[in-house]
UniProtKB/Swiss-Prot annotation:
Its EC number is 2.4.99.17. GO terms for cellular component: cytoplasm. Its main location: cytoplasm. SUPFAM superfamilies: QueA-like. Gene3D superfamilies: QueA-like. The keyword S-adenosyl-L-methionine applies. Keywords: Cytoplasm, Queuosine biosynthesis, S-adenosyl-L-methionine, Transferase. This is S-adenosylmethionine:tRNA ribosyltransferase-isomerase. Monomer.
Amino acid sequence: MRVTDFSFELPESLIAHYPQPERSRCRLLSLEGPTGALTHGTFTDLLDKLNPGDLLVFNNTRVIPARLFGRKASGGKIEVLVERMLDDKRILAHIRASKAPKPGTELLLGDDESIHATMTARHGALFEVEFNDPRPVLDILNAIGHMPLPPYIDRPDEDADRELYQTVYSEKPGAVAAPTAGLHFDEPLLAALREKGIEMAFVTLHVGAGTFQPVRVDTIEDHIMHSEYAEVPQEVVDAVLAAKARGNRVIAVGTTSVRSLESAAQAAKSDLIEPFFGDTQIFIYPGYQYKVIDALITNFHLPESTLIMLVSAFAGYQHTMNAYKTAVEQKYRFFSYGDAMFITYNPQAIFERP
């Protein structure tokens, strides 16, 4: 399959630079996987689409202020984007500079350049950086870091983004991008879902900056997926198996929840799904056999991205590309701060290729 098969025309005006004033009032495009039928509504229509006993699986990662500005001690300006926190002193990061720093290079970070760090090693495209500061890494990031808004949101981050670019149930710091399907859930909607008897479970996948990296090969089978850390604890496994046993659906909130659950299913030795704690490089594209997910809530993704490939593997290639064409025509808002889709599984998708 060619990467260009997943391209579509997107006017710049449809890229959302700010979220809706009210989280749950975004638009919702529903795609019936087996038939391709589309219906238009608002996000709170989920209440009518879910049945008592259905299980929603959320990603409770929390976005860290992962973008740092400063300079090398020798003078050159740098921008640091944390990929992951290694421990209380060290990070793995992307560094943008006129000349890549060498091991031993001292970095002066923050507006007043008061935070000192050392680049200690290079791992491929990533740099290991150690802070020379008594505070834990997370405290330093909270003090001097900027929210790492995606590259297509073409504006500086604002104070409000510290909460807006965060799900209301975020709990475990470590992501450098929000699991954006979850941004549409507010407390009143969560309460209404619970009242209806909708079950909820929480995985953790710390979204890395790799989620925004373009696919740089022509043939998607040649793409090497970036690695991200995921946790699927026993209580999630129990909730999934219980939902399946009673004939209810497992509904992933976002592609990160999909990748967490499907990673746990792939690694399972005997049962449908087993607990999973570790890095995942799962790459889902047409031809993939889904094991756990019955429905998916997700935002609209970039052309030629691994995420539109994941959706195509779930709903079917033709149904997905038609839904995107319709979304553009109907002026839905795209990407992280944009509108959402509710998609049910198409069992024929596994047989469909572009």
